[in-house]
Amino acid sequence: MITGIQITKADNDDLLHSFWLLDDENGEARCICAKKGFEEGQVVSRDALGNIEYREVPVESKPVVRVEGGQHLNVNVLSRETLEDAVNNPEKYPQLTIRVSGYAVRFNSLTPEQQRDVITRTFTESL
C-alpha cells in the first residue's frame, strides 16, 4: 500500500516539511518534494529517513495508460465499393475526405499507389 506523508519532525533537517510516498510493501520511500538534500522522484529505503514523525496526506492517482509501439486508429466510415469507384471515377468524388495517419486528406489527392494502400489497409478479411 502507498501512503502519502508530510514529515513534521525529523533528525535530518533536510526532511522537515518534505512530502513522500511510502511503499510499505517494498520498504521504500519516494520523494515528492523537499527543500534540499533530496531530489524529486528519488527513491530511498524507508530506514534511510531515520527517526521521523509525519502526518498522512491524501493521495489521488489517475490510472496510467502505457501503450508501447505508438498505436493509433483511423476511422473511415465508407465502403470498399465507394473507394474503388473513387479510384475509377474521381470526378464523382471531389470532396471525398479520409483519415490517413491522423490527418484528413482528400482521397483524390493521393497517388494511385497510396489509394490502393488505403483500400488494402482499410478493408481486410481477417487479422
From Swiss-Prot:
Keywords: Organic radical. Pfam families: Gly_radical. The modification Glycine radical is found at G102. Residues 5-127 form the Glycine radical domain. SUPFAM superfamilies: PFL-like glycyl radical enzymes. GO terms for molecular function: formate C-acetyltransferase activity. The keyword Mitochondrion does not apply. This is Autonomous glycyl radical cofactor. The lineage of its organism: Bacteria, Pseudomonadati, Pseudomonadota, Gammaproteobacteria, Enterobacterales. The gene is grcA.
